[in-house]
């Protein structure tokens, strides 16, 4: 190659390139993208001519094959080439063999491939067939190739690199200090990067860059990915806004339905009140003698009448149960002496004079009709456990307040009379005590005579019941 006349080679090589331009790969270079400028076309032509002159026909054929593989025109072949390059790289990086071992293996593989090729296809027949086809036919690609070829990509990259070098030279002339600082920073960065990352990894990154950059550059994958991501983001944005509006509408509709349902439930409950089965059973089980007649009142409760008798305020049938209930509940209250003693002893424990008996009887007789009316009115309504207790407590409170007011008035009148008159003599006190003793003895003798005469058991029980009730009231009033 080191001949003294390089111009001849140049003149001989240039026509060869011009003659070889009708090859199948070269017209594709002329059909570049519409966006490529004339400078890129000229640079691509110069690169192809230089490669043809320097490397020759076989190397140029390999370059075309590499162009097809790296431009990913045929994705399957490009993918297989990518996998093969990765396997070869890691085999060379991890194998313990020496360099000459690898060279010998490569030569041996080449020889085997050539032998197989000669055995399968005759060289002469193949050459003759190829000549006949190339002379009589010309392969034309009917599909216009809109993707830029690898030569265009290389030419564009070379132009960008040359522009970068021109700008850097201009920057060096304008500010040499900043340029020196920038170069030192870049060198320091790569030094630190090489100390932390092995050279094998950097070489593998260069291999990936060589395969993937043409893929993204020639096929406009970046622009396609950007357009798809943008459309997805727009759909997502619109979908989120629509979803929020739909949720708001559903919430407002649910609130309207809930308010309408509450209003309908209120109207329905007002028309048809609910009745508890337990309360109805208690109301039906009030009467023990006859079947009770159930009637519906205005306030939504049951009205019971015992034995089909008319309900009047002065009915004896209603007075009798009220007295029985009152006496039964009074017998359950505890008393201090459990009914022992006499009525006189209870009256003495109160400290009230005997003259108050008639006044108490008058007050009791005055309050009895009102109590009877209350008891009759209470039985006309359904008697629950809480209502019965409330009624009994009201009756007991009325009796106690009446007795207390009478006792306080009498005590005040007695105190005024005592202040107005002189103090009583000791003889009078002894007379009153003897009179009280006589009355106590007389009452005890009467009780003994009644027990000896053998009164009926019912009368004795009634007497005992009256003693207990009077004893309870007297003890309660005495406590106050």
From Swiss-Prot:
Membrane-spanning intervals of the chain: 44-64, 79-99, 102-122, 192-212
Subcellular location as annotated: Golgi apparatus, cis-Golgi network membrane; Endoplasmic reticulum membrane
Record's comment on post-translational modification: Phosphorylation at Ser-134 by CAMK2B enhances oligomerization and membrane scission and reticulophagy activity.
GO MF assignments: endoplasmic reticulum-autophagosome adaptor activity
Topology of the protein relative to the lipid bilayer: Multi-pass membrane protein
Phosphoserine, modified sites: 132, 134, 136
Pfam family, one: RHD_RETREG1-3
Motif interval(s): LIR motif: 436-441
Ranges per topology, Cytoplasmic: 1-43, 100-101, 213-480
Role: Endoplasmic reticulum (ER)-anchored autophagy regulator which mediates ER delivery into lysosomes through sequestration into autophagosomes. Promotes membrane remodeling and ER scission via its membrane bending capacity and targets the fragments into autophagosomes via interaction with ATG8 family proteins. Active under basal conditions. Required for collagen quality control in a LIR motif-dependent manner. Required for long-term survival of nociceptive and autonomic ganglion neurons.
Family: Belongs to the RETREG family.
Listed name of the protein: Reticulophagy regulator 1
């Amino acid at each position: 190659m080191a001949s003294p006349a390089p111009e001849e080679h140049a003149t001989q090589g240039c026509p060869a390139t011009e003659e070889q331009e009708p090859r199948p790969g070269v017209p594709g270079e002329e059909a570049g993208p519409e966006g490529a400028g004339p400078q890129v076309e000229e640079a691509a032509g110069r690169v192809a001519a230089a490669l043809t002159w320097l490397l020759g026909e076989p190397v140029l054929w390999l370059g075309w094959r590499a162009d097809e593989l790296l431009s990913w025109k045929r994705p399957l072949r490009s993918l297989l080439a990518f996998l093969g390059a990765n396997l070869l790289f890691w085999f060379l990086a991890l194998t313990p063999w020496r360099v000459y071992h690898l060279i010998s293996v490569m030569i041996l593989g080449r020889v085997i491939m050539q032998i197989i090729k000669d055995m399968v296809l005759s060289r002469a027949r193949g050459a003759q067939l190829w000549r006949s086809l190339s002379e009589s036919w010309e392969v034309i690609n009917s599909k216009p190739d809109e993707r830029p070829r690898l030569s265009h990509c290389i030419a564009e990259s070379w132009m960008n690199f040359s522009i970068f070098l021109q700008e850097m030279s201009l920057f060096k002339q304008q500010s040499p200090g900043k340029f020196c600082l920038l170069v030192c920073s870049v060198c320091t960065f790569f030094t630190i990067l090489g100390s932390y990352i092995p050279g094998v990894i950097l070489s593998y990154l260069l291999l990936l860059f060589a395969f993937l950059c043409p893929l993204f550059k020639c096929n406009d994958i970046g622009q396609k990915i950007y357009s798809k991501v943008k459309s997805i983001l727009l759909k997502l944005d619109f979908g989120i806004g629509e979803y929020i509006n739909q949720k708001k509408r559903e919430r407002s509709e649910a609130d309207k339905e809930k308010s309408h349902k509450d209003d309908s439930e209120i109207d329905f409950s007002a028309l048809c009140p609910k009745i508890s089965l337990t309360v109805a059973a208690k109301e039906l089980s009030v009467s023990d003698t006859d079947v009770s007649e159930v009637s519906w009142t205005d306030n939504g409760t049951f009205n019971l009448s015992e034995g089909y008798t008319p309900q009047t305020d002065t009915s004896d049938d209603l007075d009798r149960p009220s007295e029985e209930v009152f006496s039964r509940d009074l017998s359950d209250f505890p008393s201090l002496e459990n009914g022992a003693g006499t009525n006189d002893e209870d009256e003495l424990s109160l400290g009230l004079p005997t003259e108050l008996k008639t006044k108490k009887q008058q007050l009791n007789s005055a309050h009895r009709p009102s109590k009877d009316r209350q008891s009759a009115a209470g039985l006309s309504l359904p008697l629950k456990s809480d209502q019965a207790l409330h009624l009994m407590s009201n009756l007991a409170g009325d009796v106690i307040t009446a007795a207390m007011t009478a006792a306080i008035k009498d005590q005040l009148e007695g105190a005024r009379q005592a202040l107005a008159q002189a103090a009583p003599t000791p003889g009078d006190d002894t007379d009153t005590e003897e009179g009280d003793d006589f009355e106590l003895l007389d009452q005890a003798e009467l009780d003994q005579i009644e027990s000896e005469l053998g009164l009926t058991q019912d009368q004795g029980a009634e007497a005992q019941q009256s003693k207990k009730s009077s004893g309870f009231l007297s003890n309660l009033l005495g406590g106050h």
